[in-house]
Every structure is written in structure tokens, then in C-alpha cells.
Amino acid sequence: MSQRADGRSSDELRPVRFVRDFQASPAGAVLAQFGKTRVLCAVSVVDSVPRWMREQNVPGGWLTSEYQMLPGATPERTTRESRRGGPGGRSSEIQRLVGRSLRMAVDLEAVGPRTLYVDCDVLDADGGTRCASICGGMVALEIALRKLRAAGKLSTDPLRRRIAAVSAGVVAGESMLDLCYEEDSAAEVDRKSTRLNS
């Protein structure tokens, strides 16, 4: 195994850290750090469900996600998506991935008639923002569900399992785990994998 630019071996993760209660108002909030990538993941709870659920009499609650990179998250300033009329294709794909992944971890019927909004705001992007959003979103979601349960708003624990994600790729013919931006942009092949605990 060769050593990478940041000193890691090819099968080594970047340092991972979750800073709880990074934001005061949401039901659950963490700063997810994967090396130099930092994503603020916050879960807000709204006591209603989407109209389509009401119209179709779907029991339980819903979980959805929003994802965006802040203008200063990359060396070259990124225009806010709200200034461009809404999320672009990349952000839309990522927020769908985060939402679908986290819905796998929760019994939505046990959530009751509520919507859990998982907001993922990228503060610093150095590769792996999808994976950091899923992992940070999972930690923030668990915090939020515990608070709802402690407040007597949930009769059972809706958390069925935990989920995590990691990237992998082939760079200059070598398989690597947890790609930083420099590696990701040079990768011949890359993928993001999610995993549920059993």
C-alpha cells in the first residue's frame, strides 16, 4: 500500500469527528468532520406531514433532507442555489440520497404525524460531502429522536438501525478508501457506499 498526499494508507479513513449541539435551535445538530470536510447537519421537527400523505391517508410521519454547499465551502466561491432558482442537479441528487438513506433507519409510522427535516450545509468541502452528510445526519437524527422520546412525544423508539457511508475509488490504478477532493477529482472510478447495521 502506498502513502497518500495526506499521509494515509490506501485503506485508511480520514480523521472523523462529530461535534454535538453545534447549533442550539434544532432538535438535533452536529458538525460532521471528515478530514477537512465539515458539514453542519441539523434535524428540525414539524408537527405535520406532506400533503400527499394526508391525501392518501398514509399513516405515520416523513423524513426529508435538504443539502447545499455554502458559498465559501470551496476555494472558488459558489453562488447560493437560492440565487439560481433552487437546488441544482447535484444538490438534488445528494439530498434525495441522504433522505432515502436515513429513511431506512427509521420506523416512520412510529414517528407519528411529523416531518423530520434533515438539513445538511457544507461549510468546507474536501471530498466526501455526501458521506459526511449521511453520517452526520444519522447522528443528528438519533439526537432528535431521543429528545422527542424524552419529551413524551413518542411512545416507542422509532430508530430501527443506524446507517453510515463511505467513499472508495481507484486513483492511478490503486484502490483507495475515503477520497479527499484531490483524489476524487483524479479518480478513474469512484463510488459511495451506505451500510445499515443489523
Predicted regions, residues:
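Flexible, glycine/charged-enriched surface loops at secondary-structure junctions
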Residues: 2-8, 15, 108-115, 150-158
